[in-house]
């Protein structure tokens, strides 16, 4: 009845093979006892965010704003520069996922932790400086580092926001 509802297995079995079998059986996440309640709640919230994000309707399969067009299905990115020339930009999987996440929620500031959980993985153990590096590279590729009106705005101490009107369409 709810095929897009995430499944989290909560079990006492913690062996590696049990986890593999559970995930291969269709679980979206696997939590073994003993567990911390706060961690379980965080995992549930992360899974629901990903599930809800998948339900966002984009009938054309395209995200458009600030001189950028993302073809979500074909995973292609096009940028219109100041001269009106439309060029395809090659993005890595992570860069595409990051830009897509930001463009799906234009004008909304996304927290660093939320971005890390949704683009990388909720179990990411590295530094959020990785996000800064990818954002910087992405800005360079979409010509955002030369534009006085930034398309990807840094919200100090919080995260990032995509500004869909930052660049007048040519």
Which stretches of residues belong to each language-model region?
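Short, conserved catalytic or interaction motifs in soluble domains
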Residues: 12, 19, 25, 52, ...
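Positively charged, aromatic-enriched patches within helix-turn-helix-type DNA-binding elements
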Residues: 81-151, 155-158
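Basic, amphipathic DNA-recognition helix from helix-turn-helix-like DNA-binding domains
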Residues: 1-64, 141, 170
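Residues in well-ordered alpha-helical elements
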Residues: 17-20, 38, 73, 113, ...
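Heptad-repeat coiled-coil signal-transmission/dimerization helices
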Residues: 37-40, 44, 74, 131, ...
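Short, Lys/Arg-enriched segments at the junction into DNA-binding effector domains
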Residues: 46-109, 113, 162-164, 170
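Generic detector of well-ordered alpha-helical packing
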Residues: 16-19, 29-30, 72, 96-98, ...
């Amino acid at each position: 009845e709810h095929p897009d509802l995430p499944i989290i297995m909560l079990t006492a079995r913690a062996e590696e093979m049990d986890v593999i079998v559970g995930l291969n059986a269709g679980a979206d996440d696997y939590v073994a006892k003993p567990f911390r309640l706060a961690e379980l709640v965080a995992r549930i919230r992360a899974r629901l965010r990903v599930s809800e994000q998948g339900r966002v309707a984009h009938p054309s399969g395209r995200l458009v704003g600030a001189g950028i067009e993302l073809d979500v299905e074909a995973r292609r990115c096009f940028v219109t520069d100041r001269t009106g020339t439309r060029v395809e930009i090659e993005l890595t999987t992570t860069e595409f996922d990051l830009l897509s996440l930001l463009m799906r929620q234009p004008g909304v500031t996304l927290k660093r932790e939320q971005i890390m959980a949704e683009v990388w993985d909720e179990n990411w153990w590295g530094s959020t400086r990785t996000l800064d590096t990818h954002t910087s590279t992405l800005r360079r590729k979409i010509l955002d580092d030369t534009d006085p009106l930034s398309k990807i705005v840094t919200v100090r101490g919080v995260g990032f926001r995509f500004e869909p009107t930052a660049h007048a369409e040519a």
